Every structure is written in C-alpha cells, then in structure tokens.
Amino acid sequence: GPAALIEAASRPVDCVMAAIVGAAGLRPTFAAARAARRVALANKECLVSAGTVFMSAIKEAGAELLPVDSEHSAVHQSIADTDPRFIERIVLTGSGGPFRTWSAEQMAAATPEQAARHPNFSMGRKITVDSATLMNKCLELIEAFHLFPVAVDQLSVVVHPQQIVHGFVEFTDGSVIAQMGTPDMRTPIASSLAWPARMSAPATRLDLVRLGSLTFEAPDEQRFPALGLARRTLELGGTAGAILNAANEDAVDAFLERQIPFPAIAALAGAALEEGVRTGRVCEPACLDDVIAADEEGRALARGLLRRYS
C-alpha cells in the first residue's frame, strides 16, 4: 500500500525513478527526494502541483533531480553546464495530438476513442487525452519553469508532428542546441539513469535521410486553449497548479465516461482554476499537506462544475 511505497522510497539508494502517475506519487517521491542521491522524475504532479515545495525538498536534501519526460530531458541535455545568464529561451515540442488538423466543429464531436489515438506514442488513455487537448504541453511548461532557471516569458511550445526534435535551447549569442531522437521513451529513461555518462539503449536509431524533412508550426491557442492555462497558472503561483491539475484529471475522466464533450475538458479545468482564485483557495503552500489539500479542492471544484453537464 501507500505506506510501503513511502518506506521503499525512503531507503538510502543511489537513484530512485519516480514514475507513479497522479497525486498518489507525491508522498513517495518526496520521501525519495529526502533519501536518494538522485531522483529521476517522471511524475508530473511533483512539479505541476507542488513545484516550489518539491524543489525546496530537493535542495534541502542535496539530492540531484533529473527529468525523465522526453522534452525536459532534451532541454536538460541541451543546457548541460551552461551559465543560466546565457539562456535566452527554452522551447518544448509536441506532436499536436490526434486533432492537430481538426476544426473546432470537428473537435466538438470528438469521441474518447478518437482522442485516445496518439500519432506517435503508445500511452495510457488519460495522458493521450492530455496530448489531444494540449494540456500535456501546459503541464510541461509549468514543470519546465520549476526545472530550469528561466522566467515564464522565456518558455514556449512549437508543434512538431514528427517528434524527432524533443526540445531546444536558444542562447544569447543566437545559437540553438537541440536534442533529437526517435520518439522512444527508452532514450530519455537511459539518459536519466546514466547521466552524465551514456548507456546502451535499444531505441530505434535516427535516420535523417530516410525522414527527409522535419516540420514545425505554431500551436493554435484558439482551438487548443489549454496551452494558455500554463501562463495563468504560473502568474498565480502557489497552489494554482495543484487545482488546475486535479480539475483536469476529473474533467478527462468525465470526457472518457462521455459525460462532457471534448472542448469542455480545458474549459472546465480553467473554470475550476478561476473559481479557486475567486474563493481564495489559491495560496502559497507551506508543506506537502497543503498541496494535497489543494488537489482535493481542485477535484471538488471540478465536480461542482460537472453538475452543469448532468
């Protein structure tokens, strides 16, 4: 059970990979941060919901934090030991999801089955729906803000359907360093386990000649409003991330159960965040318990808004 996970994560080991999905991963990952020399982080909630508290725990313990998500791993590798003063901007890439070329009218009628078809990766249903709404990029921008020494306005997203370039960093001299590879999670996992060395991984090797060309485009925030929620959440700070993340999880569940239409996912998550602001629920967390309480409040706000669709 949960107590056993926390006990296992608390053991003094060289590296812990934190890959428990959802808020259930918060306490074990915090325990790992206090005990491990290195935490390979694949749990979004630790940074999205508990960013400042979690990073404080990492710093206090003197632990090393390495990102496992392909986009953040790409940025980490691109920055390496660069002086933060020379970083001009960080760009995360994304496939654009299964509805990249769909009109707003088409997306309004999208089914859970259609939303669950990621163009490049095989993932769980919730994560794939986040990719369809671009909420995954919203959450990744929030994570990047906590992981890397940049301001909010130095972070952006581009749509890259082939998902060969996973992220890139532009420096003050105009040069850009990017990390490339086939869309295979074994590569960033291997990087986080071996860094700064490299280990052999069975990922498919990249053949640029066979690919021929790579394309990039700006995301359409009119059709994908979830992306704009990252800026709002970071402007608010505090427990805003916990409320947004929890509300989104409940909204995705409601969509998968056919209770709400696809466009309502981002709308409901955003509305829950603003209701949290209006009712004074967004505050600065002092500890992990405050974050978990905010997660519960976000779910309660989402449930209240969901009643409008019943």
Residue ranges and their predicted role:
Residues 1-310:
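Catalytic, metal-anchored helix/loop core of enzyme active sites in primary metabolism
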